[in-house]
């Protein structure tokens, strides 16, 4: 199992602060996050592209969507910040 923590708009849009999941890569988490968001809010409009634009950290270092995961890893997905 890996621990997934969400920050920024992604946390607000999904209603998910943290969850645990089985996944082979960061990208494998996408459908799980979308499914969990819809379970918490059936009207959720979160989609793959919302997650795809996130900053990825795995165990405190920058990761990629293709980063392989192993049991005990911690993944952080954070929406990029913008504004002026």
Name these PLM-found stretches:
Residues 1-83:
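Ubiquitin-like/PB1-type beta-grasp interaction modules and other compact soluble beta-rich domains
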């Amino acid at each position: 199992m890996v621990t997934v923590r969400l920050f920024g708009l992604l946390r607000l849009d999904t209603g998910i602060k943290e969850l645990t999941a089985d996944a082979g890569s960061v990208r494998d988490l996408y459908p799980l996050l979308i499914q969990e968001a819809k379970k918490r809010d059936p009207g959720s409009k979160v989609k793959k592209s919302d997650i795809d634009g996130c900053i990825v950290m795995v165990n405190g270092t920058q990761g990629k969507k293709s980063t392989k995961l192993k049991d005990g890893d911690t993944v952080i997905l954070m929406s990029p910040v913008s504004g002026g």
